[in-house]
Amino acid sequence: MAENQTQSKEGYIIDYISGTQVKASPEELEATQVFSKILVEDYGYPKTHIQTRPQFHVKVRPSDTKKEYPVDIAVFSDTEKTDDSIYLIVECKKKNRKDGRTQLGNYLTLSKANLGVWFNGEERFYLLKQNTDDGRVLFKEIPNIPKFGERLEDIGAIKRGDLIVTHNLKSTFKAIRNYLAANAIGATRDEVLAQQLINLIFCKIYDEKYTDKKNIVRFRVGLNETCAEVRSRIDKLFSDVKTKYKEVFTKEDIITLDDNSVAYIVGELQNYCLIDAERDVLADAFETFIDHALKGGQGQFFTPRNVVKMMVEILDPDDDDMVIDPACGSGGFIIESLRYIWNKIVNRYKEMGWSDMEILEEKIDVANKCIRGIDKDYFLSKIAKAYMAIMGDGKGGVFCEDSLERPENWSSKTQTKIHFGDFSVVLTNPPFGSKIPVTGEDKLKQYELAHKWKNKKGTNDWEKMKLAEKEAPQILFIERCYQLLKFGGRMAIVLPDGVFGNNQLGYIRRFIMKRFRLVAVIDIPLETFMPNTGTKTSILIVQKLKSEDIPSDYPVFMCVAGTCGHDRRGNIKEEDDIAEISSQFKQWAVDNNFSFKNYGR
């Protein structure tokens, strides 16, 4: 779809199913096109079995011969697309849940379709039409719809090997959030709901990890199961999670959602494989629930997975590296780094004839020895710790601390595991913004960059003046990352564009140039962090060197990405320049005879 959208006239888009131009209304952009893609990519229905344009019509009343009701998405059991073969109706109108159910029920009553979906871009539900012996038509909400080729009774009978990898779960999390806000009993605050969803996501990830591919998963809800039965199975699953990861979860961690809400969430997520998802599932879930004011107030904006992957691939960590993210959030950079290193381990040691058990032991050893993360937000650091525990038993490397605080003020456990000058790789997207300044003389005087600086007229030199009363966190994180790195170590950091071009911040650029070799500056699109924030950012790649080892003249990889894989609203697009950058960097490195290893690690 995205490839052809540029060819449509203004105010129109290319319909994903039919390939024809349709008006770019909110319903089309946020619901019809989104669910059309879900039907094809996640449920496996062929486009030849789906009709969107021209719209299929059903009767308004039994006597209607014109068939006046237009159906947003009609799915058929064959390619003939007749009244007799209609199988599923999807209604995508901007109505509330009650009105949507009524209209969908009318469509199903007056057609031969037995299944219906109502989706408005933010909420969804699934209906099964049941005809009684006395001629009545009843509707039953069901946990999901069958995938292409499945029967109704196959819903929930999912084998681990049949789980599908999805490109984007944001619409699913949005639907879950809105369902819980309207229906959950007890918990209603988004922060509490987020914690409950995270608990269930960890149940899902644990189930994926420890279920054989040939066996049916436990994280499921069948067509005829009661919500209480589903809840009982999930409670047992969460008990197993807590037993295995006692260092992360406590007895106080319980699932407090009501049975119906638990069953709804399980039904929405059961078909997907979260471990292999292309996006950071936990970050997507958290961002959906924690509103803009709360996140923005703390400068917390999660890094898109394609940006994370690109930064990791450029720094190219290995099993002899020590990796840290001093603002790790929910763990995106450290999880991706661990995955990247693990892939190297598997490929390397399989060639050497190692057994699967030996490789597993090596992977766990690397997770514990080589990966560190810090975040001052308790909930986020707990998410990162749990994620690391379930993914690779690297839970001991994540700490809840203020990274900018004096290390001697950290807990003794943190001080044991994190030392200045120990790390060969730093990957981070620190919180930034003038609204969240770092204050306190004792904390600030650790940093040269916490001073005021005066430009020496007519030169590139700057003179250090008195200590400032406050400083933006992203500025101090540059210096803290320098302190964490060993000589020869490399860093990839997301920074606001002001750091690169603001004349008044020239002292920061001077600080960087005197202590690092500048390797790359990557300009990423304004849309990259939208819709959460519109701050324009770039990525800085540097290598810490002694001043005598920094060349006086050297090439720098400069890159401008025009697209980032989604639009300003967060809707997925196929155009993604960011995904190509790491391969372009590697070619540049070959052409310019550059290697981080040339300067030691």
Language-model features: where?
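Short, hydrophobic/amphipathic alpha-helical patches that form generic packing surfaces
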Residues: 33-38, 195-208, 388-390, 479
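Short amphipathic alpha-helical segments and their helix-coil junctions
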Residues: 8-20, 168-189, 265-267
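A conserved structural/catalytic subdomain of Rossmann-like adenosyl-cofactor enzymes
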Residues: 412-413, 417-601
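Conserved S-adenosyl-L-methionine
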Residues: 300-428, 433-438, 495-498, 503, ...
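Long recognition/docking surfaces used for binding and targeting
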Residues: 188, 198-291
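Structural motif
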Residues: 23-29, 184-198, 256, 275-278, ...
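A short, conserved, highly charged catalytic patch centered on acidic carboxylates
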Residues: 1-115, 122-160
